[in-house]
Amino acid sequence: MTARLRPELAGLPVYVPGKTVPGAIKLASNETVFGPLPSVRAAIDRATDTVNRYPDNGCVQLKAALARHLGPDFAPEHVAVGCGSVSLCQQLVQVTASVGDEVVFGWRSFELYPPQVRVAGAIPIQVPLTDHTFDLYAMLATVTDRTRLIFVCNPNNPTSTVVGPDALARFVEAVPAHILIAIDEAYVEYIRDGMRPDSLGLVRAHNNVVVLRTFSKAYGLAGLRIGYAIGHPDVITALDKVYVPFTVSSIGQAAAIASLDAADELLARTDTVVAERARVSAELRAAGFTLPPSQANFVWLPLGSRTQDFVEQAADARIVVRPYGTDGVRVTVAAPEENDAFLRFARRWRSDQ
């Protein structure tokens, strides 16, 4: 006889991360190719001296540093810290939704939204994208008296697109004030072309808006798992109530604080990624691919039924990309030489079609 487990888990898949194949070029996980700055490495080294002690469970110094980084309108009580922004997504579901409640988001989007909602016993309302972008009008039309939470993944993972700043502001105004809106900005540092929303302004103006950000992408700390939420103190207090104690390590906290101190230098690196993104996108289009305009550190190839063939042939060429069923492939913008290898493969594959 086996233990009796919750029936909601029976149909849920186990999360499968982007593959790592020794000797292959990994373009599957949207990691930065840049390692930590010397000042961040030094902070990490110093933090190892106290790993025999539990970390600061309240992340007091990190919250204070984040509040300073966000500006004079924010204080530590506006900030929650988690083990990556994905854990904060889970916490948001926990504090808003229970059995029979609804959580709205565009689809396809971050693939952990549906299982996180189902584990809570709530119902995921997956609204089809329009032109690979969140359709905010369609999402608004799905709101009912059972809606508790709305995720807006912006830029959207995996399709790389953003919603317009004005459209997002109008959407927030239109959503009933008792429904929490989570703007998931894991890739916000890569937005250009005047498409970056004033999400912090939305937090200031609306008590039901929370913004999620991470140190995993532009800051290059994916292995240390640090994310944070910005919102009304009541929302932040609720998130802290369901935070699993001590899950943000002392090393991660120290690295994040040092990264904020070096934010200008770290964020300048995103310009290099954006330039490569433009080059990769242009060369893919020249080769005959169709792809939406990217505002992230990856591109989206909507290959449909050809997705699996592309992924398998890429693997044969020692290049690992991220498939999404029969929808398409997400490809990280990496170092120039890695991008060149991918482009050579992509041209060969396209010429064989």
Swiss-Prot record:
Top EC class per UniProt? Answer: transferase
Coiled-coil annotated spans:
none
GO-annotated biological processes: L-histidine biosynthetic process
Q: What is its EC number?
A: 2.6.1.57
* InterPro entries documented for this protein: Aminotrans_II_pyridoxalP_BS, Aminotransferase_I/II_large, ArAT, HisP_aminotrans, HistidinolP_aminotransfase, PyrdxlP-dep_Trfase, PyrdxlP-dep_Trfase_major, PyrdxlP-dep_Trfase_small
Cofactor(s) listed in the protein's UniProt record: pyridoxal 5'-phosphate
User: Is the keyword Transferase assigned to this protein?
Assistant: yes
Its Gene Ontology molecular function terms?
histidinol-phosphate transaminase activity; L-phenylalanine-2-oxoglutarate transaminase activity; pyridoxal phosphate binding
Keywords in UniProt for this one? Answer: Aminotransferase, Pyridoxal phosphate, Transferase
Task: Please give the HAMAP family that the UniProt record associates with this protein.
Answer: HisC_aminotrans_2 (MF_01023), Phe_aminotrans_2 (MF_01513)
Biological function: Aminotransferase that catalyzes the conversion of aromatic amino acids and 2-oxoglutarate into corresponding aromatic oxo acids and L-glutamate. Shows excellent activity with phenylalanine, and lower activity with tyrosine and tryptophan. Has no significant activity with histidinol phosphate.
Subunit relationships:
Homodimer.
Which family does the similarity line name? Belongs to the class-II pyridoxal-phosphate-dependent aminotransferase family.
Name of the protein this chain belongs to: Aromatic amino acid aminotransferase
Instruction: Name its species.
Output: Mycobacterium tuberculosis (strain ATCC 25618 / H37Rv)
